[in-house]
C-alpha cells in the first residue's frame, strides 16, 4: 500500500509544482521591454541593479510600478519569489529624474497637434531646453542615435549607366550587373530592416501610453489615501460634535451632581473644577472654528488636485488620440514589401543567369540586343520601382521615429504634471497629519473632560459598590482563615494518627531502610510556611471574631449609603441604562462569596457551622463556577494519584516484591479497593465506625469514577500514539522532500552564479561597445557642431537681411502714409479753393449784371477794362485747376502703380464697384521694363503705360477728356465725374486696407519660409549624416566596402587581377561571397607587397582559397583607390558592409614597396581603417 500511495502522489506533486516566474520589464518612456526570470534575483536590490545596468538609470532614481499603479516594494517582491502566485508580472520602470520638470497642469496645455509644444508658458524656451536635456541624458530611447543608424537608400548605379548597344560588351555588362547586384543586396537588407522597425516602434508607442496610464493610476492611489485620511478626520470631527458634551455638561453639573451626595455628605460637585471646564469650553469653540476652516481649505485644495488629475487624464487620452499610429496605414507598406520581394527575386535571377554566361556568348549581336532590352527595362521600370518602395519605407520609419520622439517629450511634460500634483497632495497630507490631527486630539481631550462630568454619577456609584465588595471580600477571607486554621489542626491530628498506625504495622521491617520513622521535619516546614507557629488560642479567635463583627458593621454602613445613593440617582435626569447597570452591579456584589473547599464536609459533619449558606452557593457567578470546576478537577487528579500509589501493582520493581513481603501468603486476595481504604484497617479503635463507613463509601464512589476516567484516558492515549506515529511518518517524508529541495536549491545557486558571470561578461562587452559608440558620437557631434555653426552664420545673415527688408518696408509704409495724408490735404485744399473760386465767379457775375443793368453808359465806357480783368481771372483759375488736376492724376497713377508693384490690381467687380484684388505675376512686366527709375524703382511721371488697372484706364480717359474739352459746362461735368471717382476710391479706404493686408501677408509668408528653411536645414543635416560617399573620401564619411574581384584567365596570371583592381566598376565582386577570412592589410605597404608575391606562388589548386583585399566602392572616381586596412577581422563572414572611415593614409604607386596591388605606376591609393555600421553576412 505504501508503494501505491507513492505512485498516486507523484502526479499530484508534478501538477502542483509551480512554473518559473517570468517578468516583463517595460521602460515607461522609451517603450522598450525585457523579459526575464524573477528567480534570477535574490532580492529587490539585485533586480534594480539589473535594470540600472540595462538602461543606465541609477538605482536610487528607479521607480518601479505594477500594472494597476501599485509601487513595487521589497515585501511584494519577496512574496513573488516565495509563493510564485503573483499574477501581475509586468513591471513599469521610470527614471525619477524625468519627474524633475515640475509644472502645473492646466487646460491651456491641452494638445491639438503632433508638432505642438508641450510647454505653454512664458518660459517655454527654457523649459523646452530642459526637456531636451533630460531626454538626451536619460538613455530613454533605443533610437536616440537613429539618425546615424538609419541609412538612406541610394539610387542604383544602373540609372546613370550608358546601356547603348554600341557600348555593351562582356566586361561592361558583367561589371554593371555585378555592381547592381551589390546595390540590390544592400537595398534588400535596408528594406527588411525598415519593415522590421515599423511594428517595433508602434509597440514602443503603445507601451509609452500604458506607462503614462499606470503612472496616473499610481497618482490616483496616492491621492485616494490622502482623501481617505481627510474623510476620516471629517468623520471623527462630526462624531465629536454630535456626541460632544460642550453644551451639556453645565446642565449635568447643576441639575444632577448637585442632588447626589457622597459618603462624607457633600455633593458630587466638589470633584469638578468649574473654572477649568469654562476655560476649556471657550477653547473648544475657537478650536472648532479653526478645524472647520482648515478642513474647508483642505477640501478646496483636494478638489483642485482632483481637477489636476482630470486634466492629466484628459491630456493622456488626447495624446493617445493624436499619437497612436493608424495601423491600417501600414497595410500598403506590406503590399509594397511583397511586390519588392518579387521584383528583387526576378531581377537577381536575370542578373545571375547573365553572369553565368561565357565570354564567347557576348560576341553575338542578338544576345547583346537582348541585354540592351533587359537593361533598358530594368533601368526604366524595376530599378525605379524598387528605389521608390525603399524611399517610401524610409520616410515612413522617419515619421514614426519623429512621432515617438515628440511623444516622449509630451510624456516627460505629463510626468512633470504628475510630480506637481503629487507634491500638492503631499502638502495636504502633511497638513492633515501635523496640524489637523493635533487639533482633533486636543478637541478630543477637552470632550473627554466634559464627558467625565456626565460619567461622574455612574463612576461614583460603581466606586461605592466596589468599596462594598472589597469589605465583603475581606470579611469572608477572615472567616475562611479562621475555618482553615481549624481544618489544618484537624489535618495534622489525622496525619499523626495515620503515621503512628503505619509505624506500628510496618515499622519493624521498614527500619531496614529508614531509621527515623517518627521524624516531624515536614510538620516544622508546614509551620514555617503557615503564619501561625502554633495553634491559635482562644484570645486570637476572639480577636478574629471581633474583626469580623467590625467589618460587618462597615458593610452595613456602606450598604445604607449605596441605597441612599440609588434613591437619589433615580430622582435625577440620569439615563435609565446607567441606573440599570448600577442596580445589576449592586445585586451581583451583594451575592458575592468566595468558593473554597471545607475539609470538614468530608471528615467531620459536626464542624460545619461556619460553612457557606445554601442561598450563597446558589448565587455563584459564572466565573466562580468555572473556578469551582477547576478545583474539583485538581481534587480528582490528586485522588487518582493516591489510588495509583495505594495499588501495589503500580509500584516499581523491588518494592514489596522481594522475599521481605510480610503479606505474601496471608494477603493474596486483598482487593485494591479495600486496600485503598487501608486507613480503615489502620484506624485506631477509638474512631467511630460511622465515620469509617462514610469515608469508605465516598472512596468507593470516587474509585469507580476514576476507573472510568482512566479507561477513557487510556483510549485517548492510544489514539494519540497512533496520531503521533502518523505525524512521524509525515515528518520523515517532509524531511526527504526538504533534502531534495536543498539539492535543487544548490543546483539553482550554481546555475545562478554561472548566469551572473555570463551577465557580467555581456555587460563588459556592452560597455566596450558603448565606449566605441561614444567615440563615434563625439566625432559626429564635432561635425554636427561645425555644420550648425555654418548654418547659424547663414541664418544670422538671412535674419539681418530680413531685418533690413522689414525696416525698408516700414519706412516705405511710413512714407506712403505721409504722402497719402499730404495728398488728402492737398485735395481738400483744392476742393476748398474750387468752391471759393466758384462763389467768387457767381458773385462777380451778379455784380456785373447789376452794373450792366444800372448804367449802360458807364458800362460801355469801361467795358474794355472789366472784360480784360474777368478774362485774366478765369485764365488764372483755369490754369490753377489744370495744375491741380495734373497733380492729382500723378498721385493716383503713383498709388495704383505701387499697388500693382506689390501684386494688387485696382479693378471693377460684377456690380461695377471698385475693388482691389491679388493677381499673381502682375509685377513681372514692371520688373522687366526699363521705364522705372533706377534710384527709386518708381514709375516715370511721363509714362504710365505699364499700369494695367481698368479703373486707372477709365480715370486716364476721363483725364484726357477733361484736357481736350474747352472751358464750359461740359468741362465742369467731366471734372465732377473725375473727382467723384477719385472720392469713391479714397473714401472707402480701399487703398490703405489693401496695402496693409498685403504687407501682413508678406510678413506671414516670410515667417513660413523661415520655418521651412529651418526644417530643410534639419533635413539637410540629417541627409548629410546618412549619405554614403562615393568619391573623394574624408575621415568620418560612410562608404560601402566590398571584396575586390579576381578574374584569372590562366593559372598563375595576375594580369586580369591587376586590370580588375584598376577598373572603377569591376574593382569589386558582388556576384560571389568572399572567402572565410578576409585579407589582413598590415600597416606597411611592403608587407602587403610580400603577401601578394606569396599569393602568386601558390599552386592553382589552392588559388581559390586566397584572401582578397577589400576596397571602398568608388563609382565615379577612376584615378584613386581606397583599400581597407583590416587588422581586427572586420570582413570575416561578411558579403559587404557599410563603414565609417576613421583614418586615411596616402600612397603613390611609384615603387614596388608602395604598389602591393599592382596598380598602374603613378596611381594614387589610400589605406583606410573603418568601423562597421551595417553589413550583410555570407
Curated annotation (Swiss-Prot):
GO MF assignments: molecular adaptor activity; protein kinase binding
Keywords: Acetylation, Autophagy, Coiled coil, Membrane, Protein transport, Transport, Vacuole
GO BP field: autophagosome assembly; autophagy of mitochondrion; piecemeal microautophagy of the nucleus; protein transport; reticulophagy; ribophagy
Recorded GO CC terms: Atg1/ULK1 kinase complex; phagophore assembly site membrane; vacuolar membrane
Residue ranges the record marks as coiled coil: 538-572, 696-846
Localization terms from the record: Preautophagosomal structure membrane; Vacuole membrane
The keyword Coiled coil belongs to this UniProt entry's keyword annotation: yes
Record note on modification: Acetylated by the NuA4 histone acetyltransferase (HAT) complex.
Membrane topology field: Peripheral membrane protein
Function per UniProt: Involved in cytoplasm to vacuole transport (Cvt), pexophagy, mitophagy and nucleophagy. Recruits mitochondria for their selective degradation via autophagy (mitophagy) during starvation, through its interaction with ATG32. Works as scaffold proteins that recruit ATG proteins to the pre-autophagosome (PAS), the site of vesicle/autophagosome formation. Required for ATG9 anterograde transport from the mitochondria to the PAS. Also recruits the ATG19-prAPE1 complex to the PAS. Required for the Cvt vesicles completion. Plays a significant role in life span extension.
Complex and partners: Homodimer and potential homooligomers. Interacts with ATG1 kinase and the ATG19 and ATG34 cargo protein transporters. Interacts with ATG9, ATG17, ATG20, ATG30, ATG32, ATG36 and YPT1.
Family according to the record: Belongs to the ATG11 family.
Name of this protein: Autophagy-related protein 11
Species whose genome carries this gene: Saccharomyces cerevisiae (strain YJM789) (Baker's yeast)
Gene assigned in the entry: ATG11
Amino acid at each position: 500500500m505504501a508503494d501505491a500511495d507513492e505512485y498516486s502522489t507523484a502526479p499530484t506533486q508534478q501538477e502542483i509544482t509551480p512554473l518559473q516566474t517570468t517578468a516583463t520589464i517595460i521602460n515607461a518612456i522609451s517603450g522598450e521591454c525585457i523579459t526575464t526570470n524573477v528567480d534570477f534575483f535574490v532580492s529587490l536590490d539585485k533586480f534594480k541593479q539589473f535594470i540600472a545596468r540595462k538602461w543606465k538609470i541609477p538605482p536610487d532614481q528607479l521607480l518601479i510600478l505594477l500594472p494597476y499603479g501599485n509601487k513595487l516594494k521589497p515585501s511584494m517582491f519577496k512574496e513573488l519569489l516565495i509563493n510564485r502566485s503573483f499574477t501581475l508580472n509586468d513591471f513599469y520602470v521610470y527614471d525619477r529624474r524625468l519627474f524633475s520638470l515640475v509644472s502645473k497642469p492646466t487646460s491651456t496645455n491641452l494638445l491639438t497637434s503632433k508638432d505642438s509644444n508641450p510647454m505653454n508658458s512664458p518660459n517655454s524656451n527654457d523649459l523646452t531646453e530642459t526637456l531636451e536635456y533630460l531626454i538626451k541624458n536619460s538613455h530613454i530611447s533605443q533610437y536616440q542615435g537613429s539618425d546615424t543608424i538609419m541609412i538612406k537608400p541610394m539610387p542604383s548605379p544602373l540609372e546613370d549607366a550608358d546601356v547603348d548597344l554600341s557600348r555593351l560588351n562582356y566586361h561592361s555588362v558583367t561589371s554593371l550587373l555585378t555592381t547592381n547586384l551589390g546595390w540590390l543586396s544592400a537595398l534588400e537588407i535596408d528594406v527588411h530592416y525598415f519593415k522590421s522597425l515599423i511594428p517595433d516602434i508602434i509597440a514602443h508607442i503603445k507601451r509609452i501610453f500604458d506607462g503614462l496610464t499606470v503612472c496616473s493610476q499610481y497618482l490616483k492611489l496616492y491621492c485616494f489615501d490622502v482623501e481617505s485620511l481627510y474623510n476620516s478626520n471629517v468623520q471623527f470631527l462630526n462624531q465629536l460634535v454630535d456626541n460632544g458634551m460642550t453644551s451639556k455638561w453645565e446642565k449635568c453639573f447643576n441639575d444632577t451632581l448637585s442632588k447626589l451626595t457622597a459618603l462624607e455628605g457633600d455633593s458630587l460637585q466638589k470633584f469638578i473644577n468649574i473654572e477649568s471646564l469654562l476655560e476649556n469650553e471657550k477653547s473648544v469653540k475657537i478650536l472648532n472654528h479653526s478645524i472647520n476652516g482648515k478642513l474647508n481649505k483642505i477640501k478646496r485644495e483636494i478638489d483642485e488636485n482632483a481637477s489636476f488629475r482630470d486634466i492629466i487624464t484628459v491630456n493622456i487620452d488626447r495624446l493617445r488620440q493624436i499619437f497612436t499610429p493608424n495601423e491600417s496605414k501600414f497595410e500598403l507598406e506590406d503590399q509594397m514589401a511583397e511586390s519588392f520581394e518579387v521584383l528583387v527575386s526576378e531581377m537577381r535571377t536575370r542578373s545571375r543567369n547573365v553572369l553565368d554566361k561565357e565570354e564567347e556568348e557576348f560576341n553575338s549581336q542578338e544576345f547583346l540586343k537582348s541585354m540592351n532590352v533587359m537593361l533598358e527595362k530594368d533601368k526604366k521600370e524595376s530599378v525605379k520601382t524598387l528605389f521608390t518602395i525603399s524611399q517610401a519605407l524610409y520616410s515612413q520609419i522617419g515619421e514614426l521615429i519623429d512621432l515617438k520622439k515628440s511623444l516622449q517629450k509630451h510624456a516627460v511634460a505629463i510626468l512633470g504634471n504628475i510630480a506637481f500634483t503629487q507634491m500638492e497632495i503631499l502638502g495636504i497630507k502633511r497638513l492633515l497629519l501635523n496640524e489637523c490631527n493635533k487639533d482633533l486630539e486636543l478637541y478630543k481631550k477637552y470632550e473627554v473632560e466634559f464627558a467625565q462630568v456626565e460619567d461622574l454619577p455612574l463612576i461614583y456609584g460603581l466606586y461605592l459598590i466596589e468599596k462594598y465588595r472589597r469589605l465583603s471580600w475581606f470579611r469572608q477571607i477572615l472567616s475562611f482563615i479562621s475555618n482553615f486554621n481549624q481544618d489544618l489542626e484537624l489535618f495534622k491530628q489525622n496525619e499523626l494518627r495515620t503515621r503512628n498506625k503505619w509505624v506500628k504495622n510496618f515499622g519493624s521491617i521498614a527500619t531496614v531502610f529508614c531509621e527515623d520513622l517518627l521524624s516531624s521535619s515536614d510538620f516544622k516546614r508546614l509551620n514555617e510556611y503557615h503564619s501561625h507557629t502554633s495553634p491559635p488560642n482562644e484570645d486570637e479567635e476572639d480577636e478574629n471574631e471581633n474583626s469580623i463583627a467590625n467589618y460587618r458593621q462597615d458593610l452595613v454602613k456602606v450598604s445604607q449609603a449605596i441605597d441612599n445613593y440609588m434613591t437619589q440617582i433615580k430622582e435625577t435626569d440620569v439615563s435609565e441604562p446607567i441606573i440599570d447597570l448600577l442596580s445589576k452591579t449592586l445585586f451581583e456584589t451583594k451575592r458575592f462569596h468566595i468558593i473554597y473547599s471545607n475539609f470538614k464536609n468530608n471528615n467531620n459533619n459536626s464542624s460545619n457551622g461556619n460553612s457557606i449558606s445554601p442561598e450563597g452557593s446558589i448565587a455563584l457567578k459564572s466565573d466562580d463556577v468555572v473556578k469551582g470546576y477547576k478545583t474539583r478537577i485538581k481534587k480528582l487528579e490528586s485522588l487518582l494519584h493516591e489510588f495509583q500509589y495505594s495499588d501495589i501493582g503500580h509500584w516499581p520493581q523491588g518494592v514489596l516484591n522481594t522475599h521481605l513481603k510480610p503479606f505474601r501468603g496471608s494477603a493474596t486476595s486483598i482487593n485494591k479497593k479495600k486496600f485503598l481504604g487501608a486507613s480503615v484497617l489502620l484506624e485506631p479503635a477509638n474512631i467511630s465506625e460511622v465515620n469509617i463507613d462514610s469515608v469508605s463509601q465516598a472512596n468507593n464512589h470516587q474509585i469507580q469514577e476514576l476507573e472510568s476516567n482512566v479507561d477513557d484516558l487510556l483510549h485517548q492515549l492510544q489514539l494519540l500514539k497512533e496520531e503521533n506515529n502518523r505525524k512521524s511518518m509525515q515528518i520523515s517524508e517532509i524531511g526527504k522532500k526538504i533534502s531534495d529541495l536543498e539539492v535543487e536549491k544548490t543546483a539553482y545557486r550554481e546555475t545562478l552564479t554561472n548566469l551572473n558571470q555570463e551577465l557580467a561578461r555581456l555587460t563588459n562587452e556592452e560597455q566596450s561597445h558603448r565606449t566605441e559608440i561614444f567615440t563615434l558620437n563625439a566625432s559626429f557631434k564635432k561635425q554636427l557642431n561645425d555644420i550648425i555653426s555654418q548654418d547659424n552664420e547663414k541664418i544670422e545673415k538671412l535674419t539681418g537681411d530680413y531685418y533690413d527688408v522689414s525696416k525698408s518696408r516700414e519706412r516705405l509704409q511710413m512714407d506712403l502714409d505721409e504722402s497719402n495724408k499730404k495728398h488728402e490735404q492737398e485735395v481738400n485744399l483744392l476742393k476748398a479753393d474750387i468752391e471759393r473760386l466758384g462763389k467768387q465767379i457767381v458773385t462777380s457775375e451778379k455784380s456785373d449784371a447789376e452794373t450792366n443793368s444800372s448804367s449802360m453808359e458807364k458800362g460801355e465806357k469801361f467795358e474794355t477794362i472789366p472784360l480784360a480783368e474777368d478774362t485774366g481771372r478765369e485764365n488764372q483759375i483755369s490754369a490753377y485747376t489744370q495744375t491741380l488736376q495734373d497733380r492729382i492724376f500723378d498721385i493716383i497713377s503713383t498709388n495704383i502703380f505701387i499697388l500693382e508693384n506689390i501684386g494688387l490690381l485696382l479693378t471693377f467687380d460684377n456690380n461695377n464697384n471698385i475693388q482691389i484684388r491679388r493677381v499673381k505675376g502682375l509685377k513681372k512686366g514692371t520688373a522687366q521694363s526699363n521705364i522705372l527709375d533706377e534710384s527709386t524703382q518708381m514709375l516715370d511721371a511721363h509714362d504710365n503705360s505699364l499700369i494695367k488697372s481698368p479703373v486707372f484706364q477709365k480715370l486716364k480717359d476721363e483725364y484726357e477728356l477733361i484736357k481736350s474739352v474747352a472751358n464750359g459746362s461740359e468741362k465742369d461735368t467731366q471734372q465732377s465725374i473725375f473727382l467723384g471717382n477719385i472720392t469713391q476710391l479714397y473714401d472707402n479706404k480701399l487703398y490703405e486696407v489693401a496695402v496693409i493686408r498685403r504687407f501682413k501677408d508678406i510678413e506671414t509668408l516670410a515667417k513660413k519660409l523661415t520655418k521651412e528653411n529651418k526644417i530643410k536645414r534639419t533635413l539637410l543635416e540629417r541627409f548629410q549624416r546618412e549619405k554614403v560617399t562615393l568619391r573623394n573620401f574624408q575621415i568620418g564619411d560612410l562608404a560601402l566596402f566590398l571584396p575586390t574581384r579576381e578574374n584569372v584567365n590562366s593559372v598563375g596570371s595576375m594580369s586580369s587581377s591587376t586590370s580588375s583592381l584598376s577598373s572603377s566598376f569591376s574593382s569589386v565582386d558582388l556576384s560571389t561571397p568572399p572567402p572565410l577570412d578576409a585579407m589582413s592589410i598590415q600597416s606597411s605597404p611592403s608587407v602587403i607587397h610580400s603577401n601578394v608575391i606569396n599569393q602568386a606562388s601558390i599552386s592553382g589548386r589552392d588559388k581559390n582559397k586566397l584572401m582578397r583585399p577589400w576596397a571602398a566602392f568608388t563609382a565615379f572616381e577612376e584615378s584613386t583607390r581606397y583599400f581597407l586596412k583590416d587588422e581586427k577581422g572586420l570582413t570575416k563572414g561578411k558579403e559587404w558592409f557599410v563603414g565609417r572611415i576613421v583614418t586615411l593614409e596616402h600612397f603613390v604607386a611609384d615603387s614596388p614597396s608602395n604598389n602591393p596591388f599592382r596598380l598602374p605606376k603613378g596611381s594614387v591609393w589610400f589605406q583606410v581603417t573603418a568601423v562597421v555600421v551595417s553589413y550583410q553576412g555570407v
